[in-house]
Amino acid sequence: MDTVNKNRQLKEAKVAEIKEKLEKAQSVVLASYQGLTVEQDTNLRKSLREAGVEYKVYKNTLVTLAAKELGFDGIVEYLEGPVSIAFGYEDATAPARILNDFAKENKKLELKAAIVEGTVYNKEQTEQLAAIPSREVLLAKLLGSIKSPLSNFAYLLSAIADKKEESAE
């Protein structure tokens, strides 16, 4: 009986851990990893870690319990077979982008679904999410589009000032 209680406590602790990660993450991506070699899995984990993405494998039944408790019933249908979970805490698109890029090179990895800010997305929607650039890239593009007209305006003012100086001489 003591072993049964201990196992139950361990499972409850895992469910609590999964719930905490699901609540804390900006995005969560589920992927099927069946058939990946150890080397491929190691490379994938390294890429995800470098981007600040946590990559885990849990028992599907435990993830199901955690998801249902949080109201993410929509992901339960994707929890069949070997499923890995990538938790993105900083950049909401990073898990989908990295897993999708990896899946293009390694056909054994397949995106299944994602949760972004409480909304569940299917495989196709997750692939579309992967196409969105990172926040830093979007900010750089925005700043570039703001800076360009200002630079042109400054150049124009400089040219006018130079022309006035030439005509004054």
Swiss-Prot record:
Biological-process GO terms, alphabetical: translation
This protein's UniProt keywords: Ribonucleoprotein, Ribosomal protein, RNA-binding, rRNA-binding
Any GO CC annotation of this UniProt entry: ribosome
Molecular function in Gene Ontology: large ribosomal subunit rRNA binding
InterPro entries xref list: Ribosomal_uL10 (IPR001790), Ribosomal_uL10-like_sf (IPR043141), Ribosomal_uL10_bac (IPR022973), Ribosomal_uL10_bac_type (IPR047865)
Family per similarity comment: Belongs to the universal ribosomal protein uL10 family.
Task of the protein: Forms part of the ribosomal stalk, playing a central role in the interaction of the ribosome with GTP-bound translation factors.
Assembly and oligomerization: Part of the ribosomal stalk of the 50S ribosomal subunit. The N-terminus interacts with L11 and the large rRNA to form the base of the stalk. The C-terminus forms an elongated spine to which L12 dimers bind in a sequential fashion forming a multimeric L10(L12)X complex.
Protein name (database record): Large ribosomal subunit protein uL10
Organism listed in the record: Clostridium perfringens (strain 13 / Type A)
